[in-house]
Structures are given as structure tokens and as C-alpha cells.
Design a protein with these regions (language model features):
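Gly/Ser/Thr-rich loops at beta-strand to alpha-helix junctions
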Residues: 12-15, 87-93, 158-160, 250-253, ...
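Short glycine/serine/threonine-rich phosphate/pyrophosphate-binding segments
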Residues: 16-17, 91-96, 126-130, 253-256
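Short Gly/Thr/Asp-enriched flexible loops that form oxyanion-binding sites at enzyme active sites
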Residues: 85-108, 256-263, 292
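Internal gly/pro-rich beta-alpha loop/helix module
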Residues: 112-189
Length: 343
């Protein structure tokens, strides 16, 4: 065998098949994955599986799942060349984003995938997604290094950087989009890798470092017409949080009213971390472009550049878990740590 891949099944639609007795969808035994997807036998890859018990509906995902995933990968890191994580689509972008920050010094592929239809139904997209994910997780270059040493999402013939993804559709097979970062690879007759976009480790023999301490004291405020000072204050100034993600209009704009800016200054003055993320799916925050954006900057709000809300949340969880000093966290927030923002 030229490579070995561990498939980790957390739950989700992809692992279901119809029970011939009553017609209901039930999870199948992933130790028999090659029987369910015989196309995998054509790869010279050793495939093992690990199944969560109980399985997790992705709507119920908590940080404890991310910690478990990181520990599973850490404990089996030397045994496998790559990892495929099967996950429900609803929160896959959150999980892929956060795991990208938790796994430092990554030199092997960690590929998330899932499906819109179960593997056990005729028109499933699950088989193609799984086959492509396994092939990418096992792929090596001419030097024997992993072709994609990143956390990524493989869906509908595209490989997308995990911390750049958003769920795009609840129904279409192309469920995920990466508006601000082109695909890392595209699967057609062959898999075409966009090697210039794929991040490479500084040292291929680097030791994997796993960050399992997460601080989840983060709130999210979506700026909207009609928002009242009372509502804003309850979110931004909540004493139980260390940070607040502000989802703003366009290039990072928001209200210019005095009460709005006063609340931001109050929160920032108390040490709260305030991060500006655009509500737009594509584009970037530029607080120097308009007066309303500049007023946020002067009030102590940091630019999230073109980070997604999912990645901003995971980045804050990890940075705050690593250090209790909010000034350090603010400094690190503005750095590109693993391809999550354009610099």
C-alpha cells in the first residue's frame, strides 16, 4: 500500500442507508466502507475507520467535538498519511475552520466531506465526495510530501480551504462556496491541484501541536436597521464575553449614530475584543474607505479583512484559549495564521 487514510465518521447524512425492513435511514457500519463504496478498492490505499458513538447531528456540534477530533488526529498522526472527516453539512464550515487553528504545524491532509443525499440512495453525491476526499487525503508529490497539508472541505468536485468556506445551499450538491479564495483543487477526469494556492509547512518534519484549550466567550452581533441601543448593549457589553464579532454592511460600515459609537467605545475601553466582519459573502472590510467605517476603527474595532464569521469564531476561540491577554489576542487576530485572510 502506498498510503493510509483514516476515515472519521462523526455523523451526518453521508453515512446513512435505507433499512430494507422498514425503509428508514440508518447509519451503516463504516468498518465495511469498501463494501458500501467498492470504488475505494481501486486505490492502493489502506483505509481504516473510526466512528463516533453516539453519532452527532451537526446542528448539535459543540467545541467538545472539535477537541475530540483534534485528539484523534494527534494520537494517530504517525500511523496515517491523511485523515477524512465525515460531518453533517450544517456546521461543517465551523468545524473545518476551527480545526485549522487547532492543528498547528500540520503536514498532512485533514479533509472534511459529507453529502446532501445519503450514500444508500441512488442519486447520492456522497460516493463522489468520499472517493475524491480519500484520493486527496492519500495524494503525495514527487518528494513524498502530502499534496494538500491543510484542513479543507471536499464537496462537489472542489477542494476548498476549510477556513474560507461558507455553506452556500441547503439543497444543491455544490453546498459550499469559498468566495474569497479559489479552490485548492478541482476533480474532473483527473484531480488538478492549484499548487500555488496550497499552503506548505516551513518544515515537513515539524511536530504537530494541538491546541485543545478553547475559550468560547464570544458573541456575534449582526448590525441591522432598527437595532436599538438596548439590544446592542446586551450583546456587545455582555460581561460574560471577552469578544464580539460585528457583522457589518458592505466594506465594514455600520451606524454613525452617537449611541452606537458610544457603546463600542465603552466595550473597547473595558478591554473587549471587537472584530469587524462583513455581512457580504464576497469582499473585504476596509474601514478607511468610508467615514462610517473609519468611525468604527477610531472606536476600537479591529478589521477582520475578508475572514468569514465561521473562521473568525474559530480563530477567537483558539487565540483566547491560548492566552488570557486580550492585547495579545488583538495582535494575533490581525495576522494571517493559516490562510484565513488575504494579506
Amino acid at each position: 500500500m502506498s498510503a493510509s487514510v483514516l476515515i472519521i465518521y462523526t455523523g451526518g447524512t453521508i453515512g446513512m442507508k435505507e433499512d430494507p425492513m422498514d425503509g428508514t435511514l440508518k447509519p451503516f457500519d463504516f468498518s465495511q466502507i469498501k463494501a458500501e463504496v467498492p470504488e475505494l478498492n481501486k486505490f492502493a490505499v489502506r483505509i481504516d475507520s473510526y466512528t463516533f458513538d453516539p453519532l452527532i447531528d451537526s446542528s448539535d456540534v459543540e467545541p467538545s467535538l472539535w477537541i475530540s477530533l483534534a485528539e484523534i488526529i494527534r494520537d494517530r498522526y504517525e500511523e496515517y498519511d491523511g485523515f477524512v472527516i465525515l460531518h453533517g453539512t450544517d456546521t461543517m464550515a465551523y468545524s473545518a475552520s476551527t480545526l485549522s487553528f487547532m492543528l498547528e504545524g500540520l503536514t498532512k491532509p485533514v479533509i472534511f466531506t459529507g453529502s446532501q443525499l445519503p450514500i444508500g440512495v441512488p442519486r447520492t453525491d456522497g460516493k463522489e465526495n468520499l472517493i475524491s476526499a480519500v484520493e486527496i487525503a492519500a495524494a503525495k508529490d514527487e518528494k513524498g510530501h502530502a499534496r494538500v497539508p491543510e484542513v479543507a472541505i471536499c464537496f462537489d468536485s472542489q477542494l476548498l480551504r476549510g477556513n474560507r468556506c461558507v455553506k452556500y445551499s441547503a439543497e444543491a450538491f455544490n453546498a459550499f462556496a469559498s468566495p474569497n479564495c479559489p479552490p485548492l483543487a478541482e476533480a474532473g477526469i483527473n484531480i488538478r491541484y492549484n499548487t500555488d494556492l496550497i499552503r506548505k509547512p516551513i518544515y515537513w518534519d515539524a511536530q504537530l501541536r494541538v491546541q485543545t484549550r478553547l475559550d468560547t466567550r464570544v458573541s456575534i452581533l449582526k448590525v441591522h436597521p432598527g437595532m436599538t441601543p438596548q439590544v446592542m448593549r446586551s450583546v456587545v457589553c455582555d460581561p460574560l464575553t471577552r469578544a464580539c464579532i460585528l457583522e457589518t454592511y458592505g466594506s465594514g460600515n455600520a451606524l454613525s449614530r452617537d449611541w452606537f459609537l458610544d457603546i463600542l467605545r465603552e466595550a473597547a475601553g473595558s478591554g473587549k475584543i471587537l472584530l469587524n466582519v462583513t455581512q457580504c459573502k464576497s469582499g473585504t472590510v476596509n474601514m478607511d474607505l468610508y467615514a462610517t467605517g473609519a468611525s468604527l476603527k477610531h472606536a476600537g474595532v479591529l478589521s477582520g479583512v475578508d475572514i468569514t464569521t465561521e473562521a473568525a469564531l474559530g480563530k477567537l476561540f483558539c487565540l483566547m484559549g491560548r492566552n488570557d491577554n486580550n492585547d495579545w489576542v488583538k495582535t494575533m487576530l490581525e495576522k494571517d495564521l493559516c490562510g484565513e485572510i488575504s494579506k
